Amino acid sequence: MQRINWIDWAKALAVMSVVFCHLPQSQEWFYYRYLQALTMVIFFFISGYLKKDRGSDKENWKKYWYGLVIPYIIYNVAVYPYWLVKYYLSSGAMPDLFHALSPLLGALLLEHENEFCEPLNGPLWYLPAILIMHIIIDMCRKTKYQHWIMISLCIISFFLYTANKYWYFAPNLTPIGLMRNLPYYYMGYLFGQYHLFRNIDFKQDAIGCFAFMTFSILFFAWHLNAFYSDQHILHIVLFYPANICFIFGVLYGCKVLNRFKSPMITNISIGTLVIVGLHIVLVTIINFSIEHLLHISGTICYKWYEALPIAILIVAILYPLIIWSIKQCPILVGKEGYSWYKKETLY
């Protein structure tokens, strides 16, 4: 399948934003809360946009197994030794059996968090969420009411997410992410199925990027103001147009960048799973090192101009592993074998 350059740009920028947002920064800074709240919708929209019907449940599940299930298992297993070291450094002793099993149980429960378990590799929550969305779409396709069912589920997810923001009944992390992001996934799916959003026009795309990003920022500022004013319903309702405008603002911006074909961006896009699965380890190591070198008591808090080069450094450290994975171990980037990149050029 021929790669879509503007989608590679979107995935690469989104995954670098994920790394940036996992570097501790003050919640008082608007840009940080904005990116924290909105970045993940890019992945869900693109996942829906690229969703294909492979003709049979067997072929669909083969794709899900290699692209979502196995990477979820691998990257959870890979970070468990890191979790043990982190526990030892923070408590001064190795965990007992109960605490040692806690993150493993959390991973089995899709990065669940409660008094008995905790997420082992929290950033991976979106993989089971996307898997569930794919399965829902596949099931709905077998009926003649697929779009009515999906629209109904999106409406239900909105009300569940709204209720959960008030009563906090849904477990973290995957169920909340599923309720929150299903509408954006379905929107992407519709755009992909009906071949929408494919034309490239530099001037129109630049105007679209500026307009949608401006509206997104305004909606998000209003969304935060509603929260501080205890306007619960308005706070939730405004979150959706902020996200939708963000999606189109970012994607129009990536269409502007479509004229620039960068092999590094392509490889980062292909290696999204590597970065999502392993960056949290590097974030912790860098935070720990800087805190001790600078004798910082408590948790370090970066400014944006400090966090940005660190995020780029983390991606750069993982980049050789991405290249190796593409060439030698495709399962780490969610691929079955070598044939998928025969027509790709690696740099």
Located regions from the model:
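Alpha-helical transmembrane segments and their immediate juxtamembrane cytosolic regions
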Residues: M1-Y347
